[in-house]
C-alpha cells in the first residue's frame, strides 16, 4: 500500500521551476491533448522532463516521440523554436540503456554552439537516468576527446568533422550506435557536410534508426531519404513557414544612417535581449565596436573567433550578462535563448532560408518576438522575393511599436536557460567601466517618427549590466573597415 502511495506522490517531490506564464501561440498549443505520461516513459526521464519546466508536449513532440519510440525512421519538418530538440532527445533517452557501456546514439548538428546547447538538453532531461553524454566539436583539443572516450559514453553529440575524425581513428566506436539523429538536417546535408555524413554512416550498423529534423527540406534531404532511410514516417507541421508570434517590420534607411537608426531602436524598444545580424565577420566586429562606443553593453561572435571565446560569449549571453549580441549567421541554427525578444537584421539576408532562421531566434516556443529589418535601396528586390517565398508580409515600421506585440507582461516568467557545462567555457570576461553618454540628441536623424535622443529608459538600459559594459572578447583584433 505504501508503495502505491509513493508511486502516486512522486511528482509532488520534484523541484519544478516557476511556471512560464507568457502567452503562447498555436505553434505550440495546437496539440491533441496528450501528456508526457501518455508516452509511457520511464519514471527517471519523466522526472527530468518536469524538473526542466516542461508541462505538455508541443505538436512536434506529440507527433514524433511515439513514432521514434516505435523504432521507425522519421523525417520531421517543424518551425524553428517549437521544441524539435526535445522531440528527439526524449525518445533517445528512453531507448538508451544505461548499463550498456557503448555509444548507443549519435546526434549530429552543424555548429559548435548548437552542439553545446543540445548536449545540455540531454544532460538536463536525463539527469536522473544515469546516462552519460559527451559533446565533441572542432576547434577543441582532440586529445581531451580521446581521453573522455576511454570512459563510458552513451550519447555522442558533435559536429561532422570531429565525429568523423574520431570514428576514423577508431577512438569513437559506433558499431553499436543504433540511433542516428540529424538536427538542422537541411544544413547537415548541404554541400558543406553531405560527404562527411556519408562517410560517418559507414561506421554505424546497417539497421540503425534515423531521425531527421529541420524547418526546411530541400532536394538534398529527399535524396538522402531515398538512399538511407527505411520507410520513413514523414511529419510536416509547416502550414506556414514563419512563427505566428513574431511581428516583422522593415525600414528603408541609407547605409550611412543605419547606426543612427539602431540607436533609436535601442532607445525606443523594450528589449529583454536582442540579437543583431550582419552579413560578414568584419561588419560584426565593426558594429560591435560602434555599439559599445554609443555606451551600450555588447558582445559579438563569428566563425573566425577561437572556439573557447565563442563558447564564453554564448554562455554569458544565455545567462543574461549582456543584452545585445552582434553576430554573423553562425547563430542562426537552432540556438534557443528564451529571453531574446528582438532580432534586428542590420544587414538584410540574401535568401529566404537565412531570413527564416535569423528571425526564429526570437519568439521561441510559441512566445512573442519582434524582427526589424534595416533595408537599403539594393535590398528591395530581396525583400519582395523573401516575402513571396515565405508567404509572409513584412510591414513598414510604424512610428511607435505596440509593446504587447513582443514584451511579456511578466519578465520574471522567462525561464532560466539550461546551464552550459563549465569545462567548455573560459572564465568570465573582464568588465570595463565607462561613463554614460550625455543626455542630448544625436545629429538630426529621425527614423519612423522617433527622435534620436537618450531617454531615461535608454540610460537605464545603458547601465546593464550594473557594473559597466562588456566589450567584445579580449584578444580579438578589430578589422579596419569603412565607417557605417
From Swiss-Prot:
Extent of motif Q motif: 34-62
User: What's an example of a GO molecular-function annotation for this chain?
Assistant: ATP hydrolysis activity
Q: SUPFAM superfamilies this protein is in?
A: P-loop containing nucleoside triphosphate hydrolases
PROSITE patterns the record matches: DEAD_ATP_HELICASE, HELICASE_ATP_BIND_1, HELICASE_CTER, Q_MOTIF
InterPro entries in the record: DEAD/DEAH_box_helicase_dom, Helicase_ATP-bd, Helicase_C-like, P-loop_NTPase, RNA-helicase_DEAD-box_CS, RNA_helicase_DEAD_Q_motif
Q: Where is this motif: DEAD box?
A: 183-186
Q: Which residues form the Helicase ATP-binding domain?
A: 65-235
The catalytic activity of this protein is classed by the Enzyme Commission as 3.6.4.13
UniProt GO BP: cellular response to glucose starvation; cellular response to nitrogen starvation; deadenylation-dependent decapping of nuclear-transcribed mRNA; invasive filamentous growth; mRNA processing; mRNA transport; negative regulation of translational elongation; P-body assembly
Q: Which residues bind ATP?
A: 78-85
Q: Where is the composition biased (Low complexity)?
A: 442-484
Main site of residence? Answer: cytoplasm
Q: Where in the cell is it found?
A: Cytoplasm, P-body
Short name of one Pfam family:
Helicase_C
Which SMART domains has this protein been placed in?
DEXDc (SM00487), HELICc (SM00490)
Give an example GO cellular component term for this record. cytoplasmic stress granule
Q: What class of enzyme is it?
A: hydrolase
Domain remark from Swiss-Prot or TrEMBL:
The Q motif is unique to and characteristic of the DEAD box family of RNA helicases and controls ATP binding and hydrolysis.
Q: Which family does it belong to?
A: Belongs to the DEAD box helicase family. DDX6/DHH1 subfamily.
What is the annotated role of this protein in its UniProt record?
Answer: ATP-dependent RNA helicase involved in mRNA turnover, and more specifically in mRNA decapping by activating the decapping enzyme DCP1. Is involved in G1/S DNA-damage checkpoint recovery, probably through the regulation of the translational status of a subset of mRNAs. May also have a role in translation and mRNA nuclear export.
Q: What is this protein called?
A: ATP-dependent RNA helicase DHH1
Organism ancestry: Eukaryota, Fungi, Dikarya, Ascomycota, Saccharomycotina
Question: Its encoding gene is what?
Answer: DHH1
Amino acid at each position: 500500500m505504501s508503495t502505491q502511495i509513493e508511486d502516486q506522490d512522486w511528482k509532488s517531490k520534484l523541484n519544478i521551476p516557476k511556471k512560464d506564464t507568457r502567452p503562447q501561440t498555436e505553434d505550440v498549443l495546437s496539440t491533441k491533448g496528450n501528456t508526457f505520461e501518455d508516452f509511457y516513459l520511464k519514471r527517471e526521464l519523466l522526472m527530468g522532463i518536469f524538473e526542466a519546466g516542461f508541462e505538455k508536449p508541443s505538436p512536434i513532440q506529440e507527433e514524433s516521440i511515439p513514432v521514434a519510440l516505435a523504432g521507425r525512421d522519421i523525417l520531421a519538418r517543424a518551425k524553428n523554436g517549437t521544441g524539435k530538440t526535445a522531440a528527439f532527445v526524449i525518445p533517445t533517452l528512453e531507448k538508451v540503456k544505461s548499463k550498456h557501456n557503448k555509444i548507443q546514439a549519435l546526434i549530429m548538428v552543424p555548429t559548435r554552439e548548437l552542439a553545446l546547447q543540445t548536449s545540455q538538453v540531454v544532460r538536463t532531461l536525463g539527469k536522473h537516468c544515469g546516462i552519460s553524454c559527451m559533446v565533441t566539436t572542432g576547434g577543441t583539443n582532440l586529445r581531451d576527446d580521446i581521453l573522455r572516450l576511454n570512459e563510458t559514453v552513451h550519447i555522442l553529440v558533435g559536429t561532422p568533422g570531429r565525429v568523423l575524425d574520431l570514428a576514423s581513428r577508431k577512438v569513437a566506436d559506433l558499431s553499436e550506435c543504433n540511433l542516428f539523429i540529424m538536427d538542422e538536417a537541411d544544413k547537415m546535408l548541404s554541400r558543406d557536410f553531405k560527404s562527411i555524413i556519408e562517410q560517418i554512416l559507414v561506421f554505424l550498423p546497417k539497421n540503425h534508426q534515423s531521425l531527421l529534423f529541420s524547418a526546411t527540406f530541400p532536394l538534398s534531404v529527399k535524396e538522402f531519404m531515398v538512399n538511407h532511410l527505411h520507410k520513413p514516417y514523414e511529419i510536416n507541421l509547416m502550414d506556414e513557414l514563419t512563427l505566428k508570434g513574431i511581428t516583422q517590420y522593415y525600414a528603408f534607411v541609407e547605409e550611412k544612417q543605419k547606426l543612427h537608426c539602431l540607436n533609436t531602436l535601442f532607445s525606443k524598444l523594450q528589449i529583454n535581449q536582442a540579437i543583431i545580424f550582419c552579413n560578414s565577420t568584419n561588419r560584426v566586429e565593426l558594429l560591435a565596436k560602434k555599439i559599445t562606443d554609443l555606451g551600450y553593453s555588447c558582445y559579438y561572435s563569428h566563425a573566425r573567433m577561437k572556439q573557447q571565446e565563442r563558447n564564453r560569449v554564448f554562455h554569458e549571453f544565455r545567462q543574461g550578462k549582456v543584452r545585445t549580441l552582434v553576430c554573423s549567421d553562425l547563430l542562426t541554427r537552432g540556438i534557443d535563448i528564451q529571453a531574446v525578444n528582438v532580432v534586428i537584421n542590420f544587414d538584410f539576408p540574401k535568401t529566404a532560408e537565412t531570413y527564416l532562421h535569423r528571425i526564429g531566434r526570437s519568439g521561441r516556443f510559441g512566445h512573442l518576438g519582434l524582427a526589424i529589418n534595416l533595408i537599403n535601396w539594393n535590398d528591395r528586390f530581396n525583400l519582395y522575393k523573401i516575402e513571396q517565398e515565405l508567404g509572409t508580409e513584412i510591414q513598414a515600421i510604424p512610428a511607435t511599436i505596440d509593446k504587447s506585440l513582443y514584451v511579456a507582461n511578466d519578465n520574471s516568467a522567462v525561464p532560466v536557460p539550461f546551464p552550459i557545462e563549465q569545462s567548455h567555457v573560459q572564465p568570465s570576461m573582464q568588465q570595463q567601466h565607462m561613463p554614460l553618454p550625455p543626455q542630448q540628441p544625436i545629429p538630426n536623424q529621425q527614423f519612423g517618427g522617433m527622435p534620436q535622443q537618450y531617454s531615461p529608459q535608454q540610460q537605464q538600459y545603458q547601465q546593464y549590466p550594473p557594473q559597466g559594459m562588456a566589450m567584445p572578447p579580449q584578444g580579438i583584433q578589430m578589422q579596419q573597415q569603412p565607417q557605417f
